Amino acid sequence: MDFAQQHHQATPVLLANVWDVPSARAAAAAGYSALGTSSAAIADTFGYNDGEELSFAELLLLVTRIREQVALPLSVDMEFGYGASVAEVVDNLRALAQTGVAGVNLEDSLVADGERRLVDAETYARRLRAVKTGLEQAGVALFLNIRTDPFLLNRRQALAETVARGQLYARNGADGLFVPCVTEAADIAAIAAAVALPLNVMAMPALPDIDQLTRLGVKRISMGNALHSALQEHLHSLLQNVRQQQSFKGVFSHAGD
């Protein structure tokens, strides 16, 4: 079953979001069927803020190493595409495809002056259609999972805006719809019913469990930066314990597990 087909199963595809080779290897060892990169986790690993402060060259190098070491299908978080022009975005996606990447996330918001803003829906749809056409002309097949951010930005009419954008993107080349920060069951069900694309939601404290998400019509579940953040918190705790307790016992508490 290829990556696109994983989005049309009875149960959602569960993506492990990774940020380096060790995290990708860990996900493979844990039995995951697909991986996705987390832009926030990768940016933090390189010492940047999220929002394309990381260069595409740095991202491509990391993705290449992951692909060389782990055979699972990989979707890359490309944020706004790392290019102002459609031609730049298409060139970047072609470079990713050459590494064997199966898909990408592209989002309809931009970070400028430290603030994230939605791009006009029609403007973004034209950009998406042009990117899709450019890839088709280049003979590049990638699963385009389009992230729309009304819920992430806590917009007043988040549900209606998400549905409208999702339907528009479905007509302009999207293969999937990613709606981060949606957590209410009624909202999830409404989006899944109204938009003819596999629906991707993201792990959140209030997100329903996977069985309920399956019944609501979700087809893809990703983890965002949650794993990376949890590991960083654990690392900070270990470091503090060593200094405060003047002992390394806590560091080796899982040795042999």
Report the location of each language-model feature.
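Extended, intrinsically disordered, low-complexity segments
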Residues: 133, 224-257
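Alpha/beta enzyme core
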Residues: 1-76, 82-223, 230-232, 236
